[in-house]
Amino acid sequence: MADDLARPVFRVPDAPLKDRLPHVRPRYALPALRQHLEMFPVVMLQGPRGAGKTTLAQQVAKSKIDFSNRTDVELFEINPKGLLENAAKPVLIDEWQINPSSLWHIKHLVDEGLGGFIVAGSAGHYEPDSAHSRFPLVGRCSILRVPVLSWAEQNALLPQPLAEGLLAGDMSWAQPQELDHTGYLAIAMSTG
């Protein structure tokens, strides 16, 4: 256990995203996550299980505390404030619902002026408003909903900005596709 205390919290290597996470598809939510992190000390990712909340967060996180990892749980139990304070920011707190008290520790650090927390897990929807006054991050976090992959995301067809594409002569986005009813049904089924 003493050796575990010397273990650094998971750090993301300083390599390009395509090298670190080659399987990751571009997501519409990525620019929104970056923007929310600039504006709020905490961003809570919400969405169905398997929607890609953790994968999305790992694209911007510099460190990670994963409550599905027993070592991270033990380290958190020993020194929650130190672990959260010293983690490189932004830090992903993954599977927070396993340890809901972690939100109270984050609240106290935010109240001390610290930010850069991404909270993800599969725990239903918690709204940071006055109707949920027991929610510790009321007024301190932003909720970013992460839907399942869209058809465009599944096929890596995220468009470039329209004006940029038009100036470059790229009209590929305007090419019609012939789909019958089973094709449309297949798209609908694959995107939730």
Label each residue range with its predicted role.
Residues M1-G192:
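Phosphate-binding site recognition
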